[in-house]
Structure formats: C-alpha cells, structure tokens
C-alpha cells in the first residue's frame, strides 16, 4: 500500500502478530472505495494474516506499480526495517520475489 502496509498490517503494527481482525484506516478504505458504490459500503474491519504469519511463508511475492508507490517501495526495500513501514520486514525474508513496473522502481 501507499504507506507500506502488507495484508492490512498498517504502520506501527507489531511484526509478531499472527492472523487477526484489523480496523481499516481511512486511507485503506479510500483506496478500496473504487470497488464499492460508496465509501459507506467499504468495510471498516478485515481479517489479515499478521506479519508473523506472512514471514513464515516459504516464498513471498511483492508487487507494486505506479509512481505513487515509488517512494514507499524504496523505503521498504532499502530503508531501515521498522514497524512504520511494515513491508520493510521483508528485507529479512530469505525468498522474496519483487515485481515492479518502471514507475514503481523509479527511485531504486
């Protein structure tokens, strides 16, 4: 996501969480509004694999596209590992495939 979330694990979530119920941020709800008739129909909560669960996977795939994702992709892949950028934890996974279009990769 634009803020580095993965699987609805928003900034400042703890890395050890397992699958859990999350309250969606307004940014996440607005990003998904295009899939609904109005913002009122966008769910306020979701089930998410926690980062702890995600990190136990044998292989991971990270996909991003567009210039709007360029900065957060750079932060996640080359910045410090921090709960402020949840996707940054993927730096510690032994088998992550990253697929980016030219725009998303433009700051790397």
Where are these regions (language model features)?
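Conserved phosphate- and dinucleotide-binding cores of soluble alpha/beta proteins
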Residues: 2-108
């Amino acid at each position: 996501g634009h803020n580095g979330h993965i699987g609805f694990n928003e900034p400042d979530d703890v890395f050890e969480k397992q699958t859990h119920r999350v309250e969606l941020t307004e940014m996440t709800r607005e990003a998904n509004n295009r899939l609904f008739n109005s913002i009122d129909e966008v769910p306020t909560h979701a089930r998410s694999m926690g980062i702890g669960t995600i990190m136990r996977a044998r292989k991971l795939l990270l996909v991003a596209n567009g210039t709007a994702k360029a900065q957060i992709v750079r932060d996640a892949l080359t910045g410090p590992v921090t709960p402020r950028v949840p996707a940054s934890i993927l730096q510690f996974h032994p088998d992550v495939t990253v697929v980016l279009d030219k725009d998303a990769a433009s700051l790397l």
